[in-house]
């Protein structure tokens, strides 16, 4: 089997996918922008061949690279980056070279919030009213029909970037002034719940869920952006059966194969409202957080299903796993040294956040496990408490 990785060097924690695929005897090929000498030794040794391009954004250059690797190594069986930024490139290359997996047409349902909402409804999962915004007349119609407050996001966009909270007439006017009309927006009724949770996991080549989990955000992505808070989220030991039912129905409706999924929900009392479906793993170091919570190795598990093997099971009970960040320029009540001494049994690893995430999420990320929710909440408080 020939497996082509787009951007095998970045993000660095995803290098482990390449390493584990190679450990399964799969021929792993890479195309990226970094010089070959910059690749880590383990990554270099796991790649059968690496083709450097000047610019991964130049699709013609990338296609020529794929054609060369195809000519030299034979048909390509998989093309994958696992990275939001390159999902469309992955899909167009799959279509051009007749490779298994999501094609550009398949991405429409995960790319546009308006399309996602249609499938959430088909899956029988609660949603809030929404409207596609292309003109100022659409803005006025949404205000009249949906009513304030609303949240405004690009219909095709990721995360909290270019997001507006619309509560007053002034907010509407500000949006109209700031809005580049070439960007289609999607307005939705604002949900007052500050509780966001997820249904995340992995499906095999037949679309069957082989792993699923859930985590809660301590703060919403919008709050992180506005208030520069420390990012904290935690994988839960147990999943609410209702959330599982909704998540499984959504995964079935979207019909993706041999990929990770990351679905976000608002929690409203004892019910949930679907927010968005991400056609890739949760960002940053979240796969490592899943691994610590469930005492397994998802990099290895993914390689196993690509190789046609069973997804490996774990005999260990899940635990809470907290991922909590700190900022280098913030002044905290407790020093890192004190916290790591207090939680030495629970502490797993400290990661330095890549520059791309640091401004929004913090400079350092700490992962800790515990069987106790009470202790986990105490850890969030201790790591996050700042001096007055």
Put a short name on every predicted segment.
Residues 50-57, 131-135, 164-167:
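Short acidic-hydrophobic, aromatic-tinged amphipathic segments that line or gate anion-handling sites
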């Amino acid at each position: 089997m020939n497996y082509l990785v787009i951007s095998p060097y970045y993000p660095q924690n995803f290098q482990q996918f390449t390493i584990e695929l190679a450990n399964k005897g799969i021929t792993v090929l890479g195309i990226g922008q970094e010089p070959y000498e910059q690749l880590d030794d383990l990554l270099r040794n796991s790649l059968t061949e690496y083709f450097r391009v000047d610019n991964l954004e130049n699709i013609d250059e990338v296609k020529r690279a794929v054609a060369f690797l195809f000519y030299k190594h034979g048909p390509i069986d998989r093309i994958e980056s696992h990275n939001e930024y390159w999902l469309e490139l992955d899909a167009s290359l799959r279509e051009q070279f007749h490779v298994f997996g999501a094609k550009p047409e398949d991405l429409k349902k995960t790319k546009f919030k308006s399309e996602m909402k249609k499938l959430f409804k088909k899956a029988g999962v609660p949603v809030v009213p929404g409207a596609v915004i292309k003109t100022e007349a659409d803005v006025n119609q949404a205000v009249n029909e949906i009513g304030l407050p609303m949240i405004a996001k690009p219909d095709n966009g990721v995360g909290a970037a270019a997001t507006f909270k619309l509560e007053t007439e002034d907010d509407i006017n500000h949006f109209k002034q700031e809005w580049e009309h070439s960007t289609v927006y999607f307005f939705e009724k604002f949900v007052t719940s500050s509780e966001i949770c997820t249904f995340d996991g992995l499906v095999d080549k037949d679309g069957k869920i082989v792993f699923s989990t859930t985590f809660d955000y301590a703060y919403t992505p919008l709050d992180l952006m506005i208030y520069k808070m420390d990012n904290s989220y935690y994988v839960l030991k147990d999943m609410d059966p209702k959330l599982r039912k909704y998540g499984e129905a959504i995964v079935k409706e979207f019909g993706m194969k041999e990929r990770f999924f990351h679905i976000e929900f608002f929690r409203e009392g004892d019910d949930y409202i679907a927010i968005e479906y991400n056609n890739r793993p949760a960002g940053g170091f979240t796969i490592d957080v899943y691994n610590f919570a469930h005492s397994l190795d998802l990099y290895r598990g993914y390689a196993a299903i690509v190789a046609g093997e069973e997804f490996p099971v774990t005999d260990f009970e899940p635990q809470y796993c907290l991922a909590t960040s700190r900022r280098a320029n913030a002044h905290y009540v407790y020093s890192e040294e004190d916290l790591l001494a207090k939680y030495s049994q629970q502490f797993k690893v400290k990661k330095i956040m890549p520059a791309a995430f640091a401004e929004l999420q913090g400079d350092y990320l700490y992962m800790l496990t515990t069987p106790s929710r009470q202790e986990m909440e105490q850890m969030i408080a201790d790591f996050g408490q700042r001096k007055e």
